[in-house]
Regions:
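C-terminal non-catalytic interaction/assembly regions of soluble proteins
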Residues: 8, 15-34, 259-413
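Cap/lid and interdomain-hinge subdomains that line or gate substrate/regulatory clefts
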Residues: 66-70, 135-200, 324, 384-386
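Short Gly/Thr/Asp-enriched flexible loops that form oxyanion-binding sites at enzyme active sites
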Residues: 102-121, 205-209, 354-361
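Gly/Ser/Thr-rich loops at beta-strand to alpha-helix junctions
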Residues: 12-18, 98, 102-111, 132, ...
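N-terminal phosphate-binding or glycine-rich loops at protein starts, especially the Walker A/P-loop
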Residues: 2-44, 99, 109-118, 122-127
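Short, acidic/small-residue loops that bind anionic groups at enzyme active sites
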Residues: 99, 111-141, 148-151, 220-224, ...
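Phosphate/nucleotide-donor binding subsite
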Residues: 47-96
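Glycine-rich phosphate/diphosphate-binding loop of Rossmann-like nucleotide-binding domains
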Residues: 16-26, 35-51, 188-226, 230, ...
Length: 413
């Protein structure tokens, strides 16, 4: 008998009862087993739930009446999100969850997203929301995971021809994914190596990827755009990577200057905290990301900059900022419990950081390299190589150093 996928269907049943009931029927007609999880807080549920809201609250460590008295809508949503997350993780661990579908407005979508972010990459995840549109930020919905977001076109209030068409497609999408999905990424993936990259380090990373593949490793490339680096580190923490070549650290530069690709304070800490072998290259530390040239803040207009595309400008860090960044990189690497090697090119960190290039500023690069070298623990090897970050010979050296590092006996610091 073919496997019948189980789909967690998340919604606030006090406001979305009819819509959840409709999608539950569609999922059942499509041959799946829907499990309705009530993420509602205040009103009375409009349909039945497999996991009622009181149980959801308790699985998150709270009583429903406490959440209802939280004092603000935001605080209540945060507390209920803990329960929704706990329920879905439990179902996944019990082998009773093959996909997740959430219907909701802004808060309802965030409640579903909280659960989806806790599940491994490869588990089908779909949010249907009117908030998935316009200029709204999608980061809170997608996070660092593989969440699909579908605009509902109409608000999720009542059943009408447009709503039914969208809901039918959503049910078919998650049912199809759950039936045909590949394996979820959970557990150590043998010799998978996480590598960070941007367009300005692509030539080198392509060469490193080829070298590691020839040696029997499986490179996994992450776009270091404010999400890619944390996504790589999240997978490292989950045991899905066996090592890291962090070749592109521009997210740290963005965090220092509040650029568009900024990340949180855990960047460059996670892999080391889990003892994974790391080879670090400061690719793209010379710039931070801003929007279209005409939108640059006044304080940046006199700086060196690179016109990347009509909606992206790369702005050069000044020497004092580069020195600060070098110290940040050193401090975070010094926390590592696993083996680390640092290789740094002395003749430029990006395609535009070359003699005659728009971002060429050797004094600034020197300030970074000096601060990095001075700040690293004495037992972390630091190689300063007289070349550019995209030099083929440098890329080959980085690949060699990684292969040598993972061949060494495992040790933690």
């Amino acid at each position: 008998m073919p496997h019948q996928p189980s789909i967690a269907l998340i919604g606030t049943l006090d406001t979305k009862g009819d819509e959840i009931a409709y999608v539950r029927e569609r999922l059942a007609e499509l041959g799946t087993r829907p499990l309705v999880i009530d993420s509602g807080i205040l009103g009375e549920p409009g349909t039945s739930a497999d996991v009622p809201r009181a149980q959801v609250a308790r699985e998150g460590g709270h009583e429903l009446d406490r959440i209802q008295a939280a004092g603000s809508r935001g605080a209540a949503v945060e507390l209920m999100a803990e329960g929704v997350r706990a329920v879905c993780v439990r179902l996944w661990l019990e082998g009773r969850l093959d996909g997740v579908l959430c219907l909701g407005g802004a808060e309802g979508a965030l409640l579903g997203a909280a659960a989806m972010h806790a599940l491994p990459v490869g588990v089908p995840k779909l949010i249907v929301s009117p908030s998935a549109s316009g200029r709204r930020a999608f980061g809170p919905f997608v996070g660092e995971s593989d969440v699909l977001v579908l605009h509902s076109v109409v608000d999720i209030l009542g059943l009408n021809p447009i709503a039914r068409a969208v809901f039918d497609n959503a049910a078919a999408a998650v049912a199809g994914m759950a039936r045909e999905a590949g394996s979820a990424v959970a557990g150590l993936a043998g010799t998978s190596v996480g590598i960070t990259m941007l367009g300005h380090t692509t030539p080198a990373v392509m060469r490193i990827r080829a070298a590691l593949e020839r040696a029997g490793h499986e490179p996994v490339i992450f776009h270091a755009n404010g999400v890619g680096g944390p996504a790589m580190e999240g997978l490292a923490a989950a045991g899905a990577l066996s090592g890291v070549v962090d070749y592109t650290l521009s997210e740290l530069a963005n965090s220092l200057l509040d650029g568009l690709h900024a990340t949180g304070p855990e960047r460059l800490r996670v892999a080391g905290a889990h003892g994974l072998p790391q080879v670090i290259v400061p690719g793209c530390v010379d710039f931070f990301n801003q929007g279209a040239p005409e939108t640059l803040p006044a304080e940046y207009r006199a700086r060196r900059s690179y016109y990347h595309n009509p909606v992206a400008t790369l702005v050069r860090l000044e020497p004092d900022e580069m020195a600060d960044l070098g110290r940040v990189v050193a401090e975070r690497l010094n926390e590592a419990r696993g083996p680390v090697r640092v290789l740094a090119p002395s003749l430029g960190f990006s395609l535009a950081d070359v003699e005659g290039g728009d971002l060429w500023y050797p004094e600034a690069d020197a300030a970074f390299l000096e601060a990095l070298g001075d700040g690293l623990r004495s037992d972390i090897p630091f190689e300063l190589v007289d070349t550019h970050v995209n030099d083929p010979a440098f890329a080959d050296l980085v690949a060699e150093r990684y292969l040598a590092l993972v061949a060494e006996p495992t040790s933690t610091t």
